[in-house]
Amino acid sequence: MKPKGVIVLAFLLFAAPANAGEIYGTVTEGGKPVAAGVKVEIKVAGQIYAGETDKFGSYRVIVKEKGKGMLTVHFNGQSPSFGLFSYDKSTRYDYILEMKDSTLSIRRK
């Protein structure tokens, strides 16, 4: 393969992952992890990235854009949101869901 082709191939293989950051953490409610399969959405720069919790209430979403965004948790028919920042490196955000007057709210742990 020609040197120019090798450079182009290397750029294509390594450029996308270098710009992506991981957002991960846990979601709890009432002091316990939420069940597996709770939908988690992260919106940054107009793009929406989705994931879901595992049996430990943990979630992990790869977000390509950097900057201010919103995390939304879809739980028991309600969808509270909380602001976050996406970086080019892994960032942890742990959240607590709380029910107040039949309204679900979310806050950082």
Where are these regions (language model features)?
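Short, acidic Ser/Thr/Gly-rich low-complexity loop/linker segments typical of extracellular
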Residues: G46-S58
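Short, small/polar residue-rich loop motifs at catalytic or cofactor-binding pockets
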Residues: A20-G21, A45-Q47
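Extracellular beta-sheet/turn segments enriched in Thr/Pro/Gly and aliphatic residues
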Residues: F85-K109
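Structural motif
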Residues: Y24-A35
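Beta-strand-rich domain onsets/edges
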Residues: L12-E22, K100-K109
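Exposed aromatic-hydrophobic patches
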Residues: S58-K64
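Bacterial N-terminal signal peptides that target proteins for export
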Residues: M1-I7
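A short, solvent-exposed loop/turn motif at the edges and junctions
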Residues: K68, T72-T91
